[in-house]
Amino acid sequence: MKTVELVVPCYNEEEGLAVFIRETTKVTETIEGYSFSFILVNDGSKDGTYTVMKNLAKQYSNVKYISFSRNFGKESAMYAGLKYSTADYVVVMDADLQHPPKMLIDMCKAMEEGYDCCAARRTTREGESKIRSLFSQSFYKISNKISDVQMPYGAV
């Protein structure tokens, strides 16, 4: 059975994190041949995100978490989760369900077809600040320079 870890950067996700885990688990339980787990990365949240993470890790055996002492940014949280992962495959997803969990089904099908890497790409970044877009672009450029796996800008 192949293992997949979902790296989930979290900043002030107290209200929606349990819903994310529940909804994503509904999807992952339908995908045969894969064992899914979660790596939640608390990026210095100021709300109760850390407490929710600890409770989810107690409730679900497939939930692990990392917690930063302060906010370092989404890209740092993503990187920490990727470094911590030991799975066959890793998926980075947002906790706010902007990345539909049902896409995991198609991504696993693509992997079954023999691809080493699979990415979904957001087609628009409307409503995002220019500084946020700049940090996002920088993350992908740096990742592509230091990694053997090339990720297109906006890949999730």
What do the predicted segments below correspond to?
Residues M1-K26, G33:
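N-proximal low-complexity "stem/linker" segments adjacent to membrane-targeting elements
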